Structures are given as C-alpha cells and as structure tokens.
C-alpha cells in the first residue's frame, strides 16, 4: 500500500478541527503546554486569523487528508521593541511522532519567520518529558539560552521551562 507523501503547507480553516484534536491531547495529558483547558476550533480560528494578520507562518504537515502536526510563530512579547522576535510552537499528533514531521515543520517554519522579518526565534520548552523537542530544536541550530525554575504548575507539580534561541538572518 502506498503511503501518501508528507506535505507542509499553510494552515487553512478546514485544518483546525484536526489541529484542535492534536493540541487537546497535549493540554490534557502532558506538561508540554501550560494551557489547562483545550482551546476550541473557534479559538484556533482566532489564532490563525491573528497570525495571518501579522504575516506570521502557521503551517500544517499533512499526509493525505490527515494533519499529522502543525507549527506556527507568534510574537514573543507584546512590547514594540520585541517585534523582531517570535516564539515557535511545534506539535505532532501522538500517533505520528518519530516520523520526521516535527523536522519537516520546523524546516519550513524558520524561513517563514525570516520572511516575516523575525531576527530571533525563541522556543519555550517544559523540562519534563520534552527530550524530543529539545533535540529537534538543537538539530535546527537552537542553543539553550536559559532556564526558568518552577514557573508553571500543572497536574499537581511544578515545572521548569528551558528557553532555546536561534538567530535568523545575518549576524548583528
């Protein structure tokens, strides 16, 4: 049987039900995200529209009709001087991890960030159960820039975050 090829493309509203399901898994079962209530498809539509309005990339990786993962870049902080710094988000369907989907998404996301005018990309990664995310970011040139201790409390335990950073474009 032929397996459909993986395609990374811009997210569209029709993808958001699958994006919602992927993220809901991580919200409810892990500390990969500090959200505690899964956003609805309507919430995701607002995020998609907001990022599109800022010319920031929101991508999905699909194989046939199945969205296997998604990635997007959002503003790092709201203050104007941070306008050239974004935070990346990459999630892969739990049924499709270990297949290169995260790598395909991040490989497409970084040039999209650069086209949007970003100079720095920050990854904020929970230090518990996130070895794959840390390894993914290292493979793409991110370096650890810091650690914040006990900044989140989810599922009854305190969680540290690791900050990873990658510069885009020419050096300063």
Regions found by a protein language model. Name each.
Residues 72-75, 124-125, 138, 143-160:
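Conserved catalytic-core motifs of GNAT/GCN5-like acyltransferases
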Residues 7-19:
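A short beta-loop-alpha structural element at the N-terminal edge
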Residues 113-126:
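Conserved GNAT acetyl-CoA-binding A-motif
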Residues 20-48:
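Conserved GNAT-fold acetyl-CoA-binding loop/helix
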Residues 90-95, 99, 127-129:
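Active-site acidic-Proline motif in GNAT/NAT acetyltransferases
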Residues 98-113, 131-139:
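Conserved acetyl-CoA-binding loop-helix of GNAT-fold acetyltransferases
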Residues 5, 84-86, 140, 150-172:
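C-terminal "cap" of GNAT-fold acetyltransferases
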Residues 38-95, 106-107, 112, 167-169:
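Acetyl-CoA-dependent GNAT
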């Amino acid at each position: 049987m032929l397996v459909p090829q993986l395609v990374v493309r811009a997210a569209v509203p029709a993808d958001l039900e699958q994006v919602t399901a992927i993220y809901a898994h991580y919200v409810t079962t892990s500390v990969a995200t500090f959200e505690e209530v899964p956003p609805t498809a309507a919430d995701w539509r607002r995020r998609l529209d907001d990022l599109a309005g800022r010319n920031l990339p929101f991508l999905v990786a699909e194989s046939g009709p199945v969205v296997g993962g998604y990635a997007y870049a959002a503003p790092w902080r709201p203050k104007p001087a941070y306008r050239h710094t974004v935070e990346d988000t990459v999630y892969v369907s739990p049924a499709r991890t270990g297949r290169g989907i995260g790598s395909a998404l991040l490989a497409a996301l970084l040039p999209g960030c650069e086209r949007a005018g970003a100079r720095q990309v920050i990854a904020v990664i929970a230090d518990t159960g996130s070895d794959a995310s840390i390894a993914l970011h290292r493979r793409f040139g991110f370096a650890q820039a810091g650690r914040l201790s006990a900044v989140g409390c989810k599922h009854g335990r305190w969680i540290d975050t690791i900050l990873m950073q990658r510069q885009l474009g020419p050096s300063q």
